[in-house]
Amino acid sequence: MRRLLFRGLAFEAPPGTLVRLAGANGTGKTSLLRLLTGLMVPDAGEILYKGESITKLREDFHRDLVYIGHMNGVKDDLSARENVRIAARLGNLIVTDSQINEALGAVGLTDFTEHTTGELSQGQRRRVALARLFVSEMKPVWILDEPFTALDVQSVANLSDAVARHVRAGGIVIYTTHQECAVDVPEEKKLTVDVSAFAPKRKKKAQACLGGGDHV
């Protein structure tokens, strides 16, 4: 059975904005991320990017987007290094071995670059997925579902730094997290959207309502 997730939900994230989606489990944070990526389509409202609906700019928008969801999207029969390289190629990025090594090192996988991901723990597989961010800093929009989960203290710090650099360089980062992770960007560049505040007050035919600004 479909259910109404949001009513009257709208926010704007201009370049250089860090958006945290807050709310209890089951309030629709992951669904909202999928809507923002175009993987789901709202029954009403729209998501705008550069002033146009992402349904009209699908190819350009996806070229500018890095999305890391709950599913890691890694291939078990490929090494950690090969997974990062292929993900980069799919994103039209050319990366060197040294860049891949640096990316895997940033998430604590220096000693596992040649291991197939099928040999790795679930937490390590998550880190392989997150290593993509460290070779995708030129992609303007990052949408991340619980990116800090399963990381050690140093990897959390490295990822926080990467997110901060991206925002300070004019990128947009939209993410969910249950962890308190300090991201060093000016307060005026931060936006928290509590999705539970837009939950419907009563049950109706399901629809997802989103409004957008000139960007995401």
Where does each model-flagged region fall?
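Conserved ABC ATPase signature
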Residues: 77, 116-121
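The feature captures the beta-strand-to-loop junction immediately N-terminal to the Walker
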Residues: 22-24
